[in-house]
């Protein structure tokens, strides 16, 4: 291919790419005309083409209930974030671009008020029931107790519980069973799985906390730590006096202000009642039976 024809071809490809982006981007932000499904097309149950990032879960052998996310009106969910199923998003929570709260396996998932899920955060959980049988140690009570399947509190427990004023920094994975106490900071690219973090804990970047351990209140997990035994957790230093002593206060403040500010822009979703009306009007009739 000569140079002239090559330039012509690349120009055509560039124009086509721009046209595609101009079509996709406005709809991702709830702008422009939202196309209606053609005959034979399927739309996810209790989702909408205007807010495809927020929708209910599906029925499985480990989850017999269909649940829509519960989102407080003052929370901000970015259009490029995803919230599915049995997720509770509390007051003034910021859910940043590419963050995911996926309550379709282990449930429920709880994000307390004034907390933040920064870019790339994932919250998910292992199944908590199978064929309506409760699984031991797969849920936590709101006070941090780990629950057996026959515990009377199991039905009110959580696969993942994130308290209030908690910061989950960029790329954090919280995978249930997991518990994160109030005023706790979890640093970038860290993993918390099958573990409990107490109140006022600071976790340094790129740390791993797993193996059923419990990190006590006011502890500091140094960057890059791998905590897999209770002995390692008990030996952790105090947060006060560490480089992370006051980090969470500043991070919570920043993200609370961001949630407020973005909530005033057109990116913000409407009220829960408005969202439900659009979702009900736009979805196809779908069976709720397995």
What are the roles of these predicted feature ranges?
Residues 1-5:
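N-terminal secretory signal peptides that target proteins for export/translocation
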Residues 7-22:
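Sec-dependent N-terminal signal peptides
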Residues 43-70, 104, 108-113, 118-160, ...:
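Glycine-rich hexapeptide-repeat left-handed beta-helix
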Residues 96:
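Small cofactor-carrier domains centered on a conserved lysine used for covalent cofactor attachment
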């Amino acid at each position: 291919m000569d140079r002239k024809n090559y330039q012509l071809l690349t120009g055509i490809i560039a124009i086509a790419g721009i046209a595609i982006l101009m079509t996709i981007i406005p709809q991702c932000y709830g702008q422009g005309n939202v196309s209606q499904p053609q005959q034979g097309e399927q739309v996810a149950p209790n989702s909408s083409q205007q807010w495809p990032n927020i929708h209910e879960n599906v029925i499985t052998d480990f989850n017999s209930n269909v649940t829509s996310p519960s989102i407080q009106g003052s929370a901000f969910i970015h259009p490029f974030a995803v919230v599915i199923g049995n997720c509770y998003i509390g007051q003034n929570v910021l859910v940043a671009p590419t963050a995911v709260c996926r309550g379709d396996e282990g449930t429920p998932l709880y994000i307390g008020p004034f907390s933040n899920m920064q870019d790339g955060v994932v919250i998910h959980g292992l199944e908590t029931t199978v064929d309506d049988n409760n699984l031991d140690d797969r849920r936590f009570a709101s006070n941090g107790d780990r629950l057996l399947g026959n515990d009377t509190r199991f039905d009110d427990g959580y696969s993942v519980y994130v308290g209030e004023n908690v910061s989950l920094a960029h790329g954090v994975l919280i995978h249930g069973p997991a518990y994160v106490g109030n005023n706790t900071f979890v640093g970038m690219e860290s993993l918390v799985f099958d573990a409990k973090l107490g109140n006022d804990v600071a976790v340094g970047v790129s740390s791993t906390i797993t193996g059923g351990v419990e990190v006590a209140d006011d502890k500091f997990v140094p960057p890059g730590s791998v905590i897999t035994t209770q002995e390692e957790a008990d030996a952790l230093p105090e947060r006060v006096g560490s480089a992370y002593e006051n980090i969470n206060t500043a991070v919570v403040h920043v993200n609370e202000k961001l949630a407020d500010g973005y909530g005033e822009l057109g990116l913000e979703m409407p009220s829960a009642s408005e969202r439900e009306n659009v979702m009900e009007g736009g979805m196809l009739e779908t069976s709720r039976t397995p």
